[in-house]
C-alpha cells in the first residue's frame, strides 16, 4: 500500500545554491515560532521581566557618564554626555545580546536538531530576531531622553532603518561563525563574553570617533559597529559630521561577515546533528 508521507532528501550543494534561501523562506513560520519562544524563555520567572531591556543599557550609561563624562571629561561632540552614550548603547546592546544568543543557539537547540529536519540557519536567525523587543523598549527610552534634552530629530532620521539593518547583519554574520564553531569547540562560549567586552571598548560608545583623523576613522570603520554607532548619533542627535565613508566601509565589512558566515555555517551544517 503506497505511503502518503513526505520524504525529504538532503543533498550537498555548492555556491549560492547551498544557502537555500527559498527553503529558508518556506520555514518562516518556524522562524517566528522560535523567535517568540526565545523571547518568552528569556524573561520567564524574572521579577523585573522586560524591564531588564532598559536597565542594562541605562545603568551602563550612568557608569560611563560618571567615569568618562565627569571624571575623564571625554568629549561628546557637543552633546550632553548621558544621551551621547545612551544613543550608542541602545544599538550596541541589541548587537551584543544578539551575538551572545546566536553563538549558543545551536547547542541550546540540540534536541530539536537531532530529531527534526529544518534549515539550521533558522536557529541563529531567530536568536537575533528575538532581541528586537528589547531594542524597541530601549529605543523608546532614548526618544524620551531626546525630549528631555530638547533634541529634535532632523531629516537624517530617515537613514535610521539602514543602521538597524547593519546591526542585524553584523550580529547575524558573527553569530553564524560563532554558533558553528561552538558546536565543534565548546570553548567558544567562554570566549564570547571577552570578545563582546573588547568589542565594546573598540567601538566609539564611551568616546567619539572624531578623536581620530579622517584617514584613521575610515580604517577604524573596519569595525562594523563604528558605522552603526556614529550613524545612530548622526541620524538621531544631529552630530555635525556625516559619516559617509565610515558607513560605506562598515556596511561592506558587515555584509562580508554575513556572506562568509552563512557559507561557513552551511559547510559545517552536515555535521551538526552528529556533534551537537
Locate the predicted segments by residue.
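Hydrophobic transmembrane alpha-helices and immediately adjacent juxtamembrane helices
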Residues: 1-276
Amino acid at each position: 500500500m503506497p505511503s502518503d508521507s513526505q520524504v525529504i532528501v538532503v543533498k550537498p550543494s555548492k555556491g549560492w545554491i547551498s544557502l537555500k534561501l527559498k527553503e529558508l523562506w518556506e520555514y518562516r513560520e518556524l522562524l517566528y515560532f522560535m523567535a517568540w519562544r526565545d523571547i518568552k524563555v528569556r524573561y520567564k520567572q524574572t521579577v523585573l521581566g522586560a524591564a531588564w531591556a532598559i536597565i542594562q543599557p541605562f545603568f551602563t550609561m550612568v557608569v560611563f557618564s560618571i567615569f568618562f563624562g565627569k571624571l575623564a571629561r571625554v568629549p561628546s561632540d557637543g552633546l550632553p554626555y548621558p544621551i551621547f552614550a545612551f544613543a550608542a548603547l541602545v544599538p550596541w546592546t541589541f548587537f551584543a545580546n544578539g551575538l551572545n544568543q546566536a553563538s549558543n543557539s545551536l547547542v541550546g537547540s540540540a534536541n530539536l536538531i537531532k530529531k527534526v529536519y529544518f534549515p539550521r540557519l533558522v536557529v541563529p536567525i531567530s536568536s537575533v530576531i528575538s532581541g528586537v523587543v528589547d531594542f524597541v523598549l530601549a529605543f523608546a527610552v532614548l526618544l524620551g531622553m531626546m525630549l528631555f534634552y530638547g533634541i529634535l530629530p532632523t531629516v537624517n532620521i530617515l537613514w535610521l532603518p539602514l543602521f538597524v539593518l547593519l546591526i542585524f547583519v553584523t550580529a547575524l554574520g558573527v553569530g553564524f561563525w560563532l554558533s558553528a564553531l561552538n558546536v565543534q569547540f565548546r570553548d567558544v562560549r567562554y570566549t564570547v563574553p571577552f570578545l563582546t567586552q573588547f568589542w565594546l571598548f573598540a567601538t566609539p560608545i564611551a568616546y567619539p570617533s572624531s578623536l581620530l583623523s579622517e584617514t584613521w576613522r575610515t580604517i577604524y570603520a573596519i569595525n562594523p559597529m563604528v558605522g552603526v554607532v556614529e550613524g545612530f548619533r548622526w541620524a538621531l542627535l544631529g552630530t555635525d559630521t556625516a559619516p559617509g565613508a565610515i558607513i560605506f566601509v562598515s556596511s561592506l565589512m558587515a555584509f562580508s561577515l554575513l556572506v562568509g558566515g552563512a557559507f561557513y555555517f552551511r559547510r559545517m551544517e552536515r555535521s551538526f546533528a552528529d556533534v551537537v
